[in-house]
């Protein structure tokens, strides 16, 4: 049974294999999640730490949970903050908890497995028996080793305090009822006090950490004993030379390093065992990769342990370090020359490789051992040791050796695989040729063949016939006996040449020589075995370099800069790095685990990310040259007119400038040639297409350049226009200056990108449109996050990409930008700043201008330049951001108003409304109006600020909509017409639905037509921002009356400006703009039922009629010489006229509350 430990019927073997497979999958998830720890849990940012310190608790919460819960519950702000925090982070918290729980379950399952084996659950099987079996000792050692790796990686990649905050956050949100293992998981994940990267470690770390969930010590001791004595993975077959023994046993060395922490007594007290371990595994190395490139310096790690430190003394003595350094750096220089000689064009052909398999494999083995030692020890933790190693030679030589070794491996593998594929064919071909030669010689000595003129020799005839039969019977499957037989046959043929009858015949001798050559080829062919490639893949393993290889990115990029064709060698290096995937995937694949795909995708994705990182230098260099092209096209080369006079042709030739442009263009194409020359490469399970790789790199660099240009350009002083001094005039036009500057930069990029697209084989304008829209939408999304309870994080955003990331910039700290996350927010707030209702006046015909100087601040020209600079995507993004701002203001305003009415004004307003009812009657006196105004006057400052800001935003959105509408008609009239017709058709359908709901049903919930069409309509500017519903509100019956009183209190503060044909503020101080005021009122009324608007108009109409009635009854009291109507009546009539104009309310509706003759008299 032990012999078939991994057989299908072996439950013990299959269970252990599944456990090890699960361990590898858990580690992949740990690595994946550790890269996505929300920054808030680290509390590195002071503002975040201050904000969340009361709800982000560590394990101190467990000592007195009631105290902390009551503290949160008593504070409404903390309750809201926690709700928001939970909504944003619960998904990632669930994944982290499942990870921590999986680690604990893995440990418990491993412990249960060991207990089951010891109790005899698996018949005739013991721990000792498992450790005797080849597969058994590998799997059991790996299972314990992976447990240790999980603990080390968890403490290094997810710091203790972070783990505690995550667990407590998850516990408080889920409750202990659903979490049966929470106590055990908390015990395992409790902070160890260790800070990654810190030279100081807590006392007894990590052995105390490893002891939190203990495994049987006797089992660990047996595993360590097996690791000490056996070659578990038969590494010496791939590394037969004695000087390579430490590399041959390197996998075991990593395992024994980790497992020793489970029995620290060996590290502390067992001098003889530690000396044996060091002599066997670490005689010439002290820096190891214990898992996928995570390195450890044993001179530091084993410093606290007496026996281990003593044992390592001989290895880290300076003389030994100097000797090993000199030895390996000498190997670097020798091997570079040797590999260069092997890579000479035309040398590595099938015949040469067949003849020199052993020589090439030996060379590659030496190369890999040397690269491994130098790379690892160049990464030593102790500076004095690291300096000694680095002094030995240049890292460029190491990289050169790595590239050439990878190229040699790549070429050798390809040719050797072809030889394996054609092995049988060539074997049969040479066997037939050799056999036929013997048959011909046999016939030759028969003396019967025409023209032979040779004396018949029956013995030779018979002998050659027998040799022919023996050759025909040779079998390539048994290489050992076949090789011996071929040698005997070859020797026999050599001896037969001595016969006089043969020696005298040149023709026969030639036949014999050729036959021996065929036999020699057959010996070489029979030695072409799969084992050669298996051993080579073991030697070429680079799992130790998962992290270290990042140190060579800059040097690789320098190589590409100086020689773009160097990319071809890099392809072989990338393929060599794929060997990294073998270690974590081999067991998962072996048990056909469903985790194989997700784990493969993760590791392959990380490798592809590295490939992109190395090759991104190509688009970087391309964009450096592109900047020169932009400068030439923008400043040096004149644009050719449609028609030009013959005499002026020479002026437009600009031969020198065009030569410089051509040279720069050629440089770009040369840079891209290298990548495009690469073949499609399979990196793990991800296919890397060089053309796509180049395009992604270009996209990434384009995104970076556009984002940088926008971030650097869209920075504003944040000061509103005040007075027309020279300095302030510069501030006044700052917005236009910035927009023009950005427009010029982006236009230069766009033109040059369009120019260069054919030379690098890409669709330039398509890429430009896609990436620019993604950039703007991402920054708008991030800016809108501040208005959302449930945030959209980078990794959740549909616009963010791992391969083509959009950069994030720190927020600007100036006065205007303090609330802005990025440049889109700064631009939006600068527009609000320049159109401030307190300092500007809005006219429909021109936009916003300064009333004191008459200077236009934001007009038609501004929107045109804004379109040129940020495009359609920028305009729609700004519109979306302004919508979010307005919705936030509307929600806060309605909530505050409702709260104030419920608290103190509800009774009074109900009483006042009762007095006014019915609104068709005229009240007896105006005193009640004044009393109501006095009662509610404290609300008016809040109302005027909020409503004018809402109106201001709505006016800006209307201007954006007009700009989008205009450009859609010009640039895409067919699309505009189609959308317009579709919109009208749908409106008709909706209308008919309300008229006959039974025969014309409303679309079902899963029909997204209205939602999808609305997005197109907004982008095309076919909308009316003023009449939209932005928030859902419950009825607030007193609101129409309250809004009426507010409007009544404000209209008297405005007067009609006959020159501008608009109402303007009487006082310059604390003044507001008329148009935003009206539009703010329209917008707020649209958020309620239409009955609210009717009630509001009824109150206004009643007041106008009653006031006119009183004024006409007492003409002496009306002190206006130029009008029969009182001042506030005139203001209200103006208000109603503009209300109808902006809200598209029918005049007939208003005339139902205010008789038309009143308007006619007022207008005349």
UniProtKB/Swiss-Prot annotation:
InterPro entries: WASH_strumpellin. One of its GO terms (molecular function) is identical protein binding. Signal peptide: none annotated. It comes from the Eukaryota. GO terms for cellular component: cytoplasm; endosome; phagolysosome membrane; WASH complex. One of its GO terms (biological process) is protein-containing complex organization. Transmembrane segments: none annotated. Pfam families: Strumpellin (PF10266). Probable component of the WASH complex. Belongs to the strumpellin family. This is WASH complex subunit 5. It comes from Dictyostelium discoideum. The lineage of its organism: Eukaryota, Amoebozoa, Evosea, Eumycetozoa, Dictyostelia.
